[in-house]
Amino acid sequence: MNSITTPRMGATILRTIAPNVGVLSQVLPLGLRRVYPRGVRWVSSEIQQKDRQAGESNTATDTGVIHKTEQETLLYFDNVYARATSLWNPALWYNVLLRNQSRESVREKIKNLASPPDNPIHGLQLRSTIPVKRDGGVFATFLVPFNYTKAEVNTMIQQNTLNESKNSLFSYFTRATAFPVKGSPWIEDLKRLPSTTVIIKCQGPPLTEEEIYSLFRRYGTIIDIFPPNDTNKHFRVKYRSYRGAICAKNCVSGIEIHNTVLHLQYENVVKGHLIRNFYVTHTRIAIPVTFALLSILAVLIFDPIREFFIEQKITHQYQISWDNRYLKQLKNLTNSTVSTFKNYWGYDSSIISKRHLWEERIEKMDDLKMWLEENNNTFVLIRGPRGSGKHELVMQHTLHNRNNVLYIDCDKLIKSRTDAKFLRNAAGQLGYFPIFPWIDSVTNVLDLMVQGLTGQKSGLSETKESQFRNMLTTSLMAVRRIALKDYQSTINDAGDDVNIKEEDYLQQHPEAKPVIVIDRFEGKADINSFVYKELADWAAMLVQMNIAHVIFLTETVAANQRLSESLPNQVFKTMILSDASKANSRNYVLSELVEHYHKSLKRAKKAEEDEPTEKASPEHSQYDENDPRRYLSEELIQDIDDSLEPLGGRMLDLQAFVRRVKFGELPKEALDKMIEQASEQITQIFLSDKIDPLKSAQAWELIDLLSKNGKVYFHDIVFRPLFKAAPEIGILELENNGLITVSRDRGVLKEIRPFKPLYRAAFQYLIDDEDLKTVLMTRYHLKVINFETGRIKKWEEELRALGKINDQKLFKSRLDYLSKKITTSSDVINHCEDEIKKLSQESNNRRK
């Protein structure tokens, strides 16, 4: 027998360890010994004395041992708190946030359960409560009344607790139970979460399974009892629920039976990390599946939001702007009221509004409105040169009263240099929000990592083509929702319910379908050319589903081929916009200026009434109300007529001319400034040193030819030296860059004209300015010299190779050909050098 002796103040603590049973005893002075039962949790007097000396408490919460007298009874109340069966149990948050867990509240609850008002236990006093929040229960110490025994009090408390718990509406979940504590519980707050299995450590001879069952069954249904074996030296009792295991552990732990002390603790359930193991053992499957789930989750969350914002982009329902349908209605109401008063006073505002368009444009506007109302697969292609007013005709005059218009500018998409910029521009055009361009770089890195780990790509990263296609797909769903917003599958017709299909509804209500306007649709581009194909396919799908009207605005005929590929069996409604005739241009300019001077005259008259010293500009009242001479002088009208000849009928140029005249410039002055501005643009874009020498020389040669004649035939250009190598490529590049426009006959280039009428005057301006012409002609001749010199070098290399052959008679014809070519190019170089000398002499003479 072994013993540990600790002398302290005349007392000795002995721990006697028998073969199977440990006995705690304290040796007192005079050789007396106090033996403590093995089932009692005991703290040595030395520890208690040190606690008292340090001023620390010896409560059960701090020491883990509950102290009670023989007149007190200890019970355990279950289900007072939520059990911490796991660290992420949401019931714990409910416990903390929504339930009153103060000490007074818990004591009041225990009192009501043990001694309710309708069945009180007289003389019963609640001495202390020790919460065990991890287990969801409370240890309560009661003072036993003198007229009751402990057994009677325990029975009455158990019965009262059972009865009181049944009164709750959620009694199945919140039912509390009370059990007398038979052992000596150890109050610990270690990180040992409850489980349904209890481990029983026997300090002494082991009990039988029957004894274990009899002792533990009262706390809950037992699924199985596992006796000790070679690998596990202790009993294990598995309960069906947490309640049974928790109550058994807190009520039985520390009990002594047949000189055997039972110590209970929860089985530490080691849960397998299924997710971690799945990722480690099945990486090639787990990572793609994870990314797929994340993608699905993102679609479920963000796609409805994006559809909502696309709808707002089209309808402007919640946008504070004049495109908002409610503000439009208010504006129309106000305009109609004002128009009524104006008509009453003899002022027709509808006539003034139509002055902004000439007669042909009004007819085309009416045709476009009629096509939208016909509702027969509306697929409209409007073609016209740059500046012909396509956008103004469609957006400002035809669709300005519609509440469901989506405008897409292809130029902003095509000119996006980076993928992130492209996606942002595309999202802005469609109203696609939210968008996360930065995710692309992240997914690319992840894709590389996954490829390095698994040997295959995850498929998470997407190209900008696929992302743009997804944007269009989401936009299609939003367009369909707008078109079918007021659709009802069943309507009441004369008391009968009539079923209506979606197709029939859309066919009968063309105004419900949104209008998609795709501007600057060229069909080909150096970068991001996929945009044209995707937009064409998307528009074709919209038209085939009959959920939208689609209008394409283009400058070239190349768009026809792209659209024909997307809709091979569809007949396009084509509208061609050309420059206005001189008469229509004159009427447009005069009507704009008459309206401006009419308003200015009214303001001047009002100012004259307010300040008599001022004089209003005279009004020629002898002319009719609609006669421009009533407001404009004949001299001004003559200057306008003279300016319109070089200005032409291009809409944007006419508008710019009108603005300049309104701001006070004379017509001749406004025209000269516009010509000078156009010539500067031509010089910077086509004739600067930064441009390819060959292209710059080709541009100047055409400028020289077109300044003399309004048009040049293509067959006259083919045989010129600068165009001889690739005539069509050179002409088409200049056309795409906006210097010239080319007409075609059955697909073959025919006539070459300036890009717009004003350019011919700009060409003439460049030719007539002697100093500028000298610089440009000198630069042109130098570029021709460089071009011919390069050709001669190439031919000389071939001659050098042929000169090494002994019998040169075999290549006499080739040698003669190369000789003639070199002679011709040399003559061209000599001619250019002579011209440069002549230009230099003329320049010097002008300076003198």
Curated annotation (Swiss-Prot):
Plays a role in maintaining the mitochondrial genome and in controlling the mtDNA escape. Involved in the regulation of mtDNA nucleotide structure and number. May have a dispensable role in early maturation of pre-rRNA. The keyword Membrane applies. Residues 603-627 are annotated as: Disordered. Belongs to the YME2 family. GO terms for molecular function: RNA binding. InterPro entries: Mt_escape_2_C, Nucleotide-bd_a/b_plait_sf, P-loop_NTPase, RBD_domain_sf, RRM_dom, Yme2_C, Yme2_RRM. Its main location: mitochondrion. The keyword Mitochondrion applies. PANTHER family: MITOCHONDRIAL ESCAPE PROTEIN 2 (PTHR32198:SF2). Keywords: Membrane, Mitochondrion, Mitochondrion inner membrane, mRNA processing, RNA-binding, Transit peptide, Transmembrane, Transmembrane helix. CDD domains: RRM_Yme2p_like (cd12433). This is Mitochondrial escape protein 2. GO terms for cellular component: mitochondrial inner membrane. Residues 306-848 are mitochondrial intermembrane. It is a single-pass membrane protein. Residues 196-269 form the RRM domain. Residues 43-284 are mitochondrial matrix. The gene is YME2. Residues 613-627 have a biased composition (Basic and acidic residues). It is found in: Mitochondrion inner membrane. It comes from the Eukaryota. It comes from Candida glabrata (strain ATCC 2001 / BCRC 20586 / JCM 3761 / NBRC 0622 / NRRL Y-65 / CBS 138).
